[in-house]
Regions:
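Short acidic catalytic loops
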Residues: 66
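Auxiliary, metal-adjacent structural segments of Zn-dependent hydrolase domains
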Residues: 1-41, 95-103
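Walker B catalytic acidic pair
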Residues: 69
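Active-site scaffold of zinc-dependent metalloenzymes
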Residues: 23-63, 73-76, 81-95
Length: 103
């Protein structure tokens, strides 16, 4: 879990230029596998994601979830143009950071 939390912090710094706080919960009442808002708090739900999700390290699924959640820095609405554009920007910045060896 520490590896994923550290990666999430680095990815946030590189893609949304924001320092975040990473927390973990384990509850059926928390919708989805994770949540993030413009306040900078990312919460992973161990109950929804399962232990194996964390044990596999940094996978495509981890990156996919982080891109989705970090899009909420710019809009809470999954159907808005702002959210769509945010996902595009985050993906492009992620690529640039990986290409330059920063991630």
């Amino acid at each position: 879990m520490r590896q994923i939390a550290d990666f999430a912090g680095l990815m946030a710094a590189k893609t949304i230029n924001h320092q975040i706080t990473v927390k973990f919960c384990s509850t059926a009442h928390h919708l989805g596998g994770a949540s993030y808002g413009p306040g900078g708090e990312l919460v992973f739900n161990k109950f929804r994601l399962g232990a194996d999700w964390f044990e596999q390290g940094i996978t495509e699924e981890v990156v996919r979830l982080l891109i989705h959640e970090f899009g909420h820095q710019y809009s809470p609405d999954h159907l808005s143009a702002q959210y769509h554009e945010a996902l595009c920007r985050i993906g492009a910045k992620l690529f640039a950071s990986a290409r330059s060896g920063e991630l």
